[in-house]
UniProtKB/Swiss-Prot annotation:
Signal peptide extent: 1-29
Organism field: Scolopendra alternans
InterPro entries recorded: SVWC_dom
Tissue specificity comment: Expressed by the venom gland.
Localisation: Secreted
Family: Belongs to the scoloptoxin-16 family.
GO cellular component, one term: extracellular region
Record protein name field: U-scoloptoxin(16)-Sa1a
Primary site of residence: secreted
Molecular function terms, GO-annotated: toxin activity
Amino acid sequence: MAPPSNPLFVVLCWALFAYLMLVLRDIQAAERQYRTESRDGKCVGEDGLLHAPTELWYNDNDCSEHTCVNDNTGYYEIIRRCTLIVYPPECHLMNGTGTRYPKCCCKVTCELN
């Protein structure tokens, strides 16, 4: 069965594809929250160091941002990392433009003919 050749259908498909690419471009961060050990009123971070509540720190080796939070249930480390991006064959990944999160995250670029 041949794909539809109606020009309006083709334009609508490309418009939907372009919209989805814009949405995917903006959804780059994956955020996870982990309960963490605490010591002296501070979080023991993934890096093994002590971090005060609301402190923000980075791991430039894995392009991530970390925050220590404390609520009435305990201490947590919030970790933000780049997400895996799924993209069509006519697109490709470009390296991030910086060394620190989120600028180090890859971006998808597409060339529409």
